[in-house]
A protein has these predicted regions:
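Terminal amphipathic alpha-helical/low-complexity segments used for targeting or macromolecular assembly
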Residues: 1-143, 259-273
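Structural signal for interior beta-strand "rungs" in well-ordered beta-sheet cores
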Residues: 145-252
């Protein structure tokens, strides 16, 4: 028991996110023995957070055409070439727990949240895309769309610290960019305005909050820490630290907080602007 405690303390110093997840998993094993197989196979069987996340996402993407094992091997190649993908896993977990009032455990995104799973599936698809393995990347996009009800083109560049709440109905087009620390809710579209090729999708800068059902169309910039109200249709660039709302969206005024993606504050005063 003492040796196990020493190992846990050492892990907490080296990888506190993974240490916390393992501790939460052990607590579930004690409290919910019916879930022992799930918890052991998904969390406690693995020696790193990367292995646990890869296992969970690969199992959810498993199909008769492309097995979970093949997907795990592709992840292994990606993580060996770009260890920063594992750092993004951690940043997304912390962002999710920090911003979602419905959860306070790091384990929950890994086990249960399809928004987290969809983003991590995209990270592999994007790596494959950049390596010229476009058919495998397209396959993962298609499979992820069926499994998680999200459709993210594998060419899309996505930063870290991303929170995708509920996830259902997210659509992100090929030339879109999503920078670090962005929060998005369900039914968001980052789309084009026609059938022209080239750079035609939105650029979402750091710290932006995009409300449920918002549609942002065209090659326009949403400035850092801007806030897009739920249900808005955005057709023009949005300045940084600004709230827009409506169909079509109009400027309501400056944000009442400097980091809307972290506070998740969707409300604004009727007399703003």
């Amino acid at each position: 028991m003492a040796q196990r405690q020493v190992r846990a303390e050492a892990l907490d110093k080296v990888d506190p996110v993974w240490a916390r997840i393992r501790g939460e998993a052990e607590e579930i094993m004690r409290r919910e023995p019916e879930l022992a197989t799930l918890i052991y196979s998904t969390i406690l069987h693995h020696d790193s957070l990367e292995a646990a996340v890869v296992h969970r996402v690969a199992e959810r993407l498993d199909s008769p055409e492309v097995s979970a094992e093949m997907i795990r091997q592709a992840y292994a190649d990606a993580l060996e070439a770009e260890p920063s993908i594992g750092e993004a896993f951690r940043a997304d977990i912390v962002a999710t727990v920090d911003r979602d009032p419905a959860t306070n455990r790091y384990l929950e995104p890994v086990l249960y949240f399809k928004g987290f799973h969809a983003i991590q599936a995209h990270r592999l698809a994007h790596w494959l895309w950049n390596k010229g393995r476009k058919d495998f990347a397209y396959y993962l996009q298609s499979r992820s769309s069926a499994a998680f009800q999200t459709d993210i083109n594998p060419a899309v560049r996505i930063g870290r610290g991303i929170f995708l709440d509920h996830a259902t109905g997210l659509v992100v087009g090929e030339t879109a960019v999503i920078e670090d620390d962005v929060s998005m809710l369900q039914e968001v579209t980052l789309g084009g305005t026609g059938k022209e090729a080239g750079d035609r999708h939105p650029k979402i800068r750091r710290g932006v909050l995009i409300g449920a059902g918002a549609k942002i169309l065209g090659n326009i910039e949403i400035g850092h820490c801007a806030r897009i109200a739920a249900g808005s249709v955005v057709l023009k660039p949005v300045p940084h630290n600004t709230t827009v709302a409506g169909v079509p969206a109009r400027v309501i005024g400056p944000n009442s907080c400097s980091e809307p993606s972290r506070t998740m504050d969707h409300l604004f005063e009727d007399n703003d602007g």
